[in-house]
Amino acid sequence: AGIYGPGRGPFAKVRKGTARRIIKQGQVFSRIHVEDIAQALELSLAKPQPGAIYNLCDDDPAPPQDVIGHAAALLGLPLPPAVNFDEAEMTPMARSFYAESKKVRNDRIKQALGWAPQFPTYRAGLAALLAQDS
């Protein structure tokens, strides 16, 4: 899952006017707020289950263009331009990031440790980040 939190998210690019909404049909990514990672680590230390592997993510895998669009809306800025993935100028590393969807589920950690993300959607997480910035 893509990690976001203070200093790491879409707001800087949207504010600078360099954000783009890369459109690739069917593309979704799972994300997780850094505070949710910390909470999961605390729970796993309190309830150790040696050998257990957990996927950490929020409950709402979403297309990257939706996240950029929502960040712009929260900032009251215009929607960044949409660019088709096939036509987008990107570094090879950035292009490889978009090569496939990166969607995972968090059911196991919820059941085993009683974990629930404080920010179950990117919308909740971005709103909290913006409130922290203010």
Positions of predicted regions on the chain:
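Substrate-positioning beta->alpha
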Residues: I3-K13, R21-L45, A52
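Residue-level signal for the nucleotide or nucleotide-sugar donor/cofactor binding architecture
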Residues: I32, A62, V104, P117-P120
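Residues in well-ordered alpha-helical elements
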Residues: E35, Q65, D107, P120-R123
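Mid/C-terminal beta-alpha module of Rossmann-like enzyme folds, strongest
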Residues: A38-A94
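Conserved C-terminal active-site "lid" loop/helix of NAD(P)H-dependent oxidoreductases
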Residues: G69, E89-A116
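Amphipathic terminal alpha-helices
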Residues: P120-S134
